Amino acid sequence: MSLLIRGATIVTHDESYRADVYCADGVIKAIGENLDIPAGAEVLDGSGQYLMPGGIDPHTHMQTPFMGTVASEDFYSGTAAGLAGGTTSIIDFVIPNPQQSLLEAFHQWRGWAEKSASDYGFHVAITWWSEQVREEMAELVSHHGINSFKHFMAYKNAIMAADDTLVASFERCLELGAVPTVHAENGELVYHLQRKLMAQGITGPEAHPLSRPSQVEGEAASRAIRIAETIGTPLYLVHVSTKEALDEITYARSKGQPVYGEVLAGHLLLDDSVYQHPDWQTAAGYVMSPPFRPRGHQDALWHGLQSGNLHTTATDHCCFCAEQKAAGRDDFSKIPPGTAGIEDRMAVLWDEGVNSGRLSMQDFVALTSTNTAKIFNLYPRKGAIRVGADADLVLWDPQGTRTISAKTHHQQVDFNIFEGKTVTGVPSHTVSQGRVVWADGDLRAERGAGRYIERPAYPAVFDLLSKRAEQHKPTAVKR
């Protein structure tokens, strides 16, 4: 199978230029003009369009068991929806139950993901600590291509990682060359505020953001960053949603600390007024953690992207239908938190970022693809347009439009947080492994076509930190 994309303007994270791209055997074989290609190659006309690396979503939760139910989007439907939106790879999460073997959970998630329509990888969550966990982390890194571990600082009495677990796991990540990531919310404070609001009779979705104010995220971000600084490991903060958390990242980076921030498309656009909707079901549809924030935080997050202190855009794609959300009808803390977005992320970011002048096209590529590939050691196999890279590409029509709606999206959920928004700039074609899987509204996703992509431990940042540590190595005082 071979494919020639002709006439498009190639846009990468650092340049744009006119050239044709020839793909065969799932990879990019040649880039240039007037390419000599074999007869019979499929030809796409990219005139007037941009050819960019396929999107990589570093934060999804397909088919996740949580709060007594299971996310409505499975690995096939979710990755297929991603292809319709220009996303050609995801990094999902293995979340072991407390006391469950990490390896057992990993193989369980691998089995679920075999139906994926696009390439995928995993972060593995550390939900408890023991010598077994410590050893299995090494097994996952050395034999299963895991180079990042997730820590939930929220969800008390469930999967929350207390400080002793953070310290032990961060230390182990440093030894293994794996990146620790954190969901930064103070779980003790959230639990306290949830009970307090319930006692006051505030039981609806409007209580959700009140139980998780911006200070809760700011404190946890600060704590995680300080722990990482003390131990000497890099740190990646998922779904940064507040100015307070961004300020902590910015300060740490100003001192040379390798801290990376991720922002969700929804947090860039929506504010907490959505929880005041008079219809309970609609308000509950927006419940996710961290919640959408008061006005002002959105501008701060855009500035974080522009300044380089936020590095990736994601979705935290975790779908629960209205019937599932109804479990919290009388207690907001029992509403399964999660929203969709994998199909919409790239178009929303283009419309609100590039079209508004907030971001350049090169910024867009970096934030939707290349930076994730670099941070999690997928680059240049992913996130790049160069000979030898995977032929995961999106042909982008800057004049194309789409009105987002749950009635027409491909995501397996009955709600869309961007409902009714018309975006300008959409994928006309998506290419995965050199095969056209989305063509002008025709979704050609294939169940099981996705591959598990191993991500080896990443030495670059860790070598740097090791040199720093050696220079400041403490010594005993001779007496």
Each model region followed by its residue ranges:
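Histidine-rich, glycine-flanked metal-binding segment
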Residues: 1-53
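Divalent metal-coordination and catalytic microenvironments
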Residues: 8, 26, 48, 59, ...
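Metal-associated gating/positioning segment near the N- to mid-region
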Residues: 46-115, 132
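A glycine-rich helix N-cap at a beta->alpha junction
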Residues: 111-126
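Histidine/acidic residue-rich metal-binding segments in metalloenzymes
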Residues: 135-313, 318
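His/Asp/Glu-enriched, well-ordered alpha-helical/loop segment
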Residues: 206-234, 285-286, 306-313, 319-399
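C-terminal cap of metal-dependent C-N hydrolases
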Residues: 327-331, 387-453
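Intein/HINT protein-splicing elements and their conserved insertion hotspots or analogous self-processing inserts
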Residues: 440-479
